[in-house]
Amino acid sequence: MCIRDRVSLVPTSAVGAFAEGDVLPVLFFSVMFGFALLAVGSKGRAVVDGVHAVSQVLFKMVAFAMYVAPIGAFGAMAFTVGRFGASSLLALGNLVVMFYVLCALFVVAVLWPIARAFRVDMPRLIRYIGAELMIVVGTNSSESVFPRLHAKLRALGVDPPIVALVLPTGYAFNHDGTCLYFASVAVFLAQAVGLNLTIAQQLGLLAILLATSKGGAGVAGSAIVVLASTLAASGTIPVASVALILGVHRLLSSAFVPVNVLGNAVATLAIARMEGALNVATFEHELRRPRADVSDDPSDIDDRRREAVFERRPHRDDVRA
């Protein structure tokens, strides 16, 4: 990136950056605005609440657009098949299969060793939050299970302050599956439009993805919006090419959203182990349960913690005897 490109990151006016759709200047302004809000402390609380409310409204508008997205996907797929032949469907099918294999490899080769290093039984953890994983497969939204995942991690014996800090932070910044999605789809779209990306272009695209993917919402359809914004900011891949994957985006999101949820659960448990904020007796007791159906009621969590302690004590006494 030359000096002129770096200087262009600073918008001449915030309104102009938003009006012209310059993603990187908007992102720069947003980051600086966030730092300023952090610096003023409690005085900026009303502004933070207002920005949060506006973001919820905007994402609801995106949700409305996603209701008619199948029509656009149908048109895009019809155009693709009509112009390039049925072989384009085979390419999309290969993308879906490859991506599912990639997500499975990530869980086995990355998340599993991390969980094992912190003495977390991955198969039991997957079974424990299996209902939440199935929900996000159907809804394609990690936000839909946030309350239940929060409650289940507390029921596992993780101290509430750790859950309250790590889990929301992970929802905002730890998008393992989404990063896999961005990388895979970006390379696929580049090949689909006949572009051979150089190493410098790939690294530049990766840098922009690292910036634009952070702070994203866990609502259905937000990933493809971020992808389109990233391609517009990079200028290397035509934004119109995103229409090629609209027909299979739902299948792809059914793979990467559960990876996001599982990654945040593993991260919360790992940090709890590191900080000594995990009740081991409760943790082992909950993972041994044949079924895990935890409500969001804090009193239910406290009852299950006490139950775990009382069930564990006789076992320890028997061992000592």
Give the location of each predicted region:
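Short, small-residue-biased leader/transition segments that mark boundaries at the very start
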Residues: 1-3
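Hydrophobic alpha-helical segments of integral membrane proteins
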Residues: 5-10, 14, 47-65, 89-96, ...
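Membrane-interfacial loop-to-helix junctions in multi-pass transporters
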Residues: 21-25, 62-67, 101-102, 118-125, ...
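Hydrophobic mid-bilayer segments of alpha-helices in multi-pass membrane transport proteins
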Residues: 24-36, 68-75, 109, 226
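Transmembrane helix-loop junctions in multi-pass membrane proteins
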Residues: 37-48, 77-91, 122, 192-196
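Entry/N-cap segments of selected transmembrane alpha helices
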Residues: 86-111
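Helix-loop-helix junctions within the multi-pass membrane cores of secondary transporters/permeases
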Residues: 131-213, 268, 286, 290
